[in-house]
Amino acid sequence: MTGISLALNPRQVFGNKNKFLRAQGITPVHIFGHGLKSLALQANTQELESTISRAGSSHLVSLKLDTDKKTRKAFIREIQRHPVKGYLQHVDFYQINLKEKVTAEIPIHFSGESPLLKEKGHKLTAPFTHLTVEALPDDLPPEIHIELSQFDSPEKDLYIKDIVLPGNARILNEPDLLVAKVSEIHLKVETPVTASLPEEPEEKPAAAAEEKETAEKE
């Protein structure tokens, strides 16, 4: 993924007046961070939606302020939307220090083909969609890539301890947790249940005696 950038401008409108900004296709934004005074800004709503779609919560965004000569690196921290209509109401960015390690949820991406998955009767088990990674901001991988071609036998399991990340990035999840495996699908064959005929009720003694007495009288 190429670098993600977003242009921001100073905001002079606050509180309930922000609805007039939204009507013009502008969304209120805040930047905050460790040792940083919160900045009230605004962004083009369409550009902001595109940034959210591309960056999620795990990719760094280069924020470009027209009043700043420097580019600020930040994560999307919080997104507020209208509870019914779903449009953007507000977005918070958290500016980070490029010299300090950060922690982020990085998505897992599977690619390639497994010889076993081409065959019928096998399935991929992958309990995780994201893993927790710690690294310097510029060393955070955009995704954790797993090649499916390595799964060439049912005995092949991939654990967190088997994944090697570039640079100084490291996975914080427990190393012995299973990340992926290809296993056989075992179909459960159910034995059909044979319906049994209801038993005829036994003749009551009183009724039998009554029939015998009637027969003798005749």
Swiss-Prot record:
Q: What superkingdom does the record give?
A: Bacteria
**Could you state one GO cellular component term attached to this entry?**
cytosolic large ribosomal subunit
The record's section on Pfam families has:
Ribosomal_L25p, Ribosomal_TL5_C
Disordered: annotated segments:
191-218
* One GO biological process term: translation
Q: Which GO terms describe its molecular function?
A: 5S rRNA binding; structural constituent of ribosome
Presence of keyword Glycosyltransferase: no
Which keywords belong to this entry? Answer: Ribonucleoprotein, Ribosomal protein, RNA-binding, rRNA-binding
Question: Is S-adenosyl-L-methionine one of the keywords?
Answer: no
Biased composition (Basic and acidic residues) is annotated at 203-218
Protein purpose: This is one of the proteins that binds to the 5S RNA in the ribosome where it forms part of the central protuberance.
Q: How does it assemble?
A: Part of the 50S ribosomal subunit; part of the 5S rRNA/L5/L18/L25 subcomplex. Contacts the 5S rRNA. Binds to the 5S rRNA independently of L5 and L18.
Family assignment? Answer: Belongs to the bacterial ribosomal protein bL25 family. CTC subfamily.
Q: What is this protein called?
A: Large ribosomal subunit protein bL25
